From Swiss-Prot:
<dbReference type="GO" id="GO:0019005">
    <property type="term" value="C:SCF ubiquitin ligase complex"/>
</dbReference>
<dbReference type="GO" id="GO:0031146">
    <property type="term" value="P:SCF-dependent proteasomal ubiquitin-dependent protein catabolic process"/>
</dbReference>
<keyword id="KW-0539">Nucleus</keyword>
<feature type="domain" description="F-box">
    <location>
        <begin position="2"/>
        <end position="55"/>
    </location>
</feature>
<keyword id="KW-0833">Ubl conjugation pathway</keyword>
<comment type="function">
    <text>Component of SCF(ASK-cullin-F-box) E3 ubiquitin ligase complexes, which may mediate the ubiquitination and subsequent proteasomal degradation of target proteins. Is necessary for responses to strigolactones and may be involved in the ubiquitin-mediated degradation of specific proteins that activate axillary growth. Targets probably SMAX1A to degradation upon the formation of an E3 SCF ubiquitin ligase complex (ASK-cullin-F-box) containing MAX2B and KAI2IA in response to (-)-germacrene D in the stigma.</text>
</comment>
<dbReference type="InterPro" id="IPR041567">
    <property type="entry name" value="COI1_F-box"/>
</dbReference>
<dbReference type="GO" id="GO:0005737">
    <property type="term" value="C:cytoplasm"/>
</dbReference>
<dbReference type="InterPro" id="IPR006553">
    <property type="entry name" value="Leu-rich_rpt_Cys-con_subtyp"/>
</dbReference>
<comment type="subunit">
    <text>Part of a putative SCF (SKP1/Cullin/F-box) ubiquitin ligase complex. Interacts with KAI2IA in the presence of (-)-germacrene D.</text>
</comment>
<dbReference type="Pfam" id="PF18511">
    <property type="entry name" value="F-box_5"/>
</dbReference>
<dbReference type="GO" id="GO:0005634">
    <property type="term" value="C:nucleus"/>
</dbReference>
<dbReference type="InterPro" id="IPR032675">
    <property type="entry name" value="LRR_dom_sf"/>
</dbReference>
<keyword id="KW-0963">Cytoplasm</keyword>
<protein>
    <recommendedName>
        <fullName>F-box protein MAX2 homolog B</fullName>
    </recommendedName>
</protein>
Amino acid sequence: MAKTPIPFTTLNDLPDVILSNIIAAVSDTRSRNATALVCHKWLVLERSTRTSLTLRGNIRDLFMLPTCFRSITYLDLSLISPWGHPLLASRATDAPDNDSALIAHLLRHTFPSVTSLTLYARDPNTIQFLPAQWAHTLKHIKLVRWHQRAQLASGDELNLLFIGTPQITSLDLSNFYCWTDDVPPALQSNPNVACNLTRFNLLNASFPEGFKTDEIKVITKCCPNLKEFKVACMFDPRYIGFIGDEALVCLATNCPKLSVLHLADTSVLSNCRGDPNDEGFTVEDAQFSVSTLIEVFSGLSLLEELVFDVCNNVRDSGPALEILKTKCPKLRSLKLGQFHGISMPIESKLDGVALCQGLLSLSIRSVGDLDDMGLIGIGRGCSRLTKFEIECCKKITMRGMRTLASLLRKSLVDVTISCCKNLGASSSLKALEPIQDRIQRLHIDCVWDTVEEFENLDGVEYGFDLNEASGGEASSNPAGFGDTFGSMDDDLMNNRNKRCKYSYDLNSVYVENNGHGNGFCGRTWDRLQYLSLWIGVGELLTPLAAAGLQDCPKLEEIKIKVEGDCRLWSKPSERAFGLSTLIQYPKLVKMHLDCGDIIGYAHTAPSGQMDLSLWERFYLMGIRHLNLRELDYWPPQDRDVNQRSLSLPAAGLLQECVTLRKLFIHGTAHEHFMMFLLRIPNLRDVQLREDYYPAPENDMSTEMRADSLSRFEVALNRRQICD
């Protein structure tokens, strides 16, 4: 008798409710798109469960507005083409015209459940009428604007927003060009909206001076229920109204529910590279005391994330940071700028930030007195760190950084080393060898040093067993942490300047001399997925592999930032920058090439100089060898004429990268240069974005005209894509 065949069961046989929950749990956009291609049933379920959507079409093509995403709660309208142009037509009257009203109505009808909205708001008309379409459901709004502010009275734009969206609890103005004077009046005029706010982001690089004491007092008084507050401040005591003791105490008193607090000086937000030779101390000290910091931290017991990034000395901050351990037990992320005395262990005792044993992320910048032993103290105390950033710390050497990496070998996966005099590319990579099989994200500076330089470094012997670094005497307390260095020799800590033979051969990856080898071998960065590089103008990328990054089998994304004044160079030393060397990374598909901080001559250069078009050719030469799918490119700029435009050589070289599917140019381009890009066979998405301050206002130039961009998009969408 023949056996009855067992029916083959597939995922599609699951009940629709269960299958719908499975698909709803998928968050990655590309994975959801692939899910929708399986069959019609999965397509319907994917569309009905998608909650996040970014629209990229042209606003004039309303017939293409998708109507199947009825469950969208997060809607991003900041990238609609043509980028940066008003979404709703501007009028002198208080009411939108018919076209604008139709656009707003269709968006609300298509996406009825929006609770979070991101919007490019170039004019007040858009701010007033579009968010108001979801007045009863909208909770979070992010406004984006890189163009100049409209000529209105202080606070008028935000007042229009608050009147139309009375239910919002979260407001993000971090990329919205406005004045600090706009915020306090709008909050005072709408006390109910201000009282409802729980998240407020004012970390805006466009503020020339940041918020001052009186403004901070008004904002925090109007918003007592804030749980997340990020703000650009003025800490420089040379300015009237600088942030000092009064403002900090007022903040902690008025907003005791804060779990996320970011206080950053406006000069930090510009992301300009510091001077590696700087000692880390400024002429002026910040005008708030350690006792004030202790009072503030004591009043914010719910803190989970703290950024205190100032540009003036905060001296002897160790005792205040020790308070964080007991007063802010939930603290997991900490960033400090210009704080001194954060880790100065004496007689084997940990102190300062090293006692914050619950930290998962730590970032430090311009700590003038931090040396290798202080860094090792941090590694001993903060043994759970998964992310570590260090910037502008002149006294740190490769030996201290390597010891820290060894101590945190089991947890550390994200590292940034920037602008440290003794940590160039090779020394940084050598220091990170203990975690090279675990690290996933990395930033280094492409300052090409050599191994021979390491051997001449002054230092001490950190002669303790790194295999026991997370245990030993330091783990004697019930929590598994301690306040001492444990197995480290006390004499070593008493004599911080003692010199003796280093404990491992710098030409080997083993630690053998003291019998405490940890077996770090090989040169493969097995899990590295993201790499960020800083490089000075005129320098070459070709030594990257020789520095220690020759084998990165899983590297998918790279960001290269080039900075400097090319007017100081007659020409580069080689014909090409070295992008072709990146072909050794087989999975590299996404690149950010940021030449936006290169300064040069956009037009005719003086005799003996190269204009920016030739520099663009230098940096893009060889890009055709890479199998990139997505590229973000920032052209170099001429600040004298506020021009950041794609040149003819750049357009010609970009068209040779035939694998590209997405190309975003953060600048302007002539229409006929853009037409070169149509020769890329699989290119699906191209956009010009002037997302820098100040964005050009002249919309009549061929680089900016909306009709020019629309003609290119029509030609792009008219092509047949092979897949």
